[in-house]
């Protein structure tokens, strides 16, 4: 079931309700900032605190307009270019476009990705349940 974000504007009369439905599909690019023990990468030595500081620094740099692809190349603990096409819950993935179902992604990654507008940047913070691989700095590109 797709989620909708609704805002009620209360005036004298009538009451207006504006709903923004999540898109059926998105394409995002992301930077994964992991720490030792979250992914099988032997040369990863940073601890959780170091990863959090680095992720927040990169997030701010991206929000301030640094080239996102350059940041991905320099910092991601995932593969470059780190681009994922996703279909929302209830929408069949288009296999011909290498699209993933949102349900296959970690929850925080999917939640942030589908809330962003095109060219917006968001941060999915590490959580052992919803973002178990580390911090994801996400830019929606389509």
Language-model-detected regions and their locations in the chain:
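Positively charged n-region of N-terminal signal peptides that target proteins for export
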Residues: 1-4
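Repetitive helical segments and hydrophobic/amphipathic motifs
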Residues: 11-12
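C-terminal motif of bacterial Sec signal peptides marking the signal peptidase cleavage site
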Residues: 15-18
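Bacterial Sec signal peptide processing site at the extreme N-terminus
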Residues: 20-30
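Acidic/histidine-rich, surface-exposed loop or edge segments in extracytoplasmic proteins
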Residues: 29-41
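Peptidyl-prolyl cis-trans isomerase
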Residues: 45-142
């Amino acid at each position: 079931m797709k989620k909708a974000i609704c805002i009620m504007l209360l005036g004298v009369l009538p009451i207006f309700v504006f709903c923004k439905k999540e898109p059926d599909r998105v394409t995002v690019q992301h930077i994964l900032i992991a720490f030792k023990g979250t992914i099988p990468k032997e040369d990863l030595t940073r601890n959780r605190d170091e990863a959090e500081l680095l992720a927040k620094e990169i997030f701010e740099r991206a929000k301030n307009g640094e080239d996102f692809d350059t940041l991905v190349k320099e910092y991601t603990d995932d593969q470059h270019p780190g681009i994922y096409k996703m279909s929302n819950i209830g929408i069949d993935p288009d296999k011909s476009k290498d699209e993933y179902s949102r349900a296959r992604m970690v929850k925080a990654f999917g939640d942030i990705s589908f809330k962003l507008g095109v060219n917006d940047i968001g941060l999915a913070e590490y959580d052992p349940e919803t973002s178990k691989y580390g911090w994801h700095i996400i830019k929606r590109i389509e």
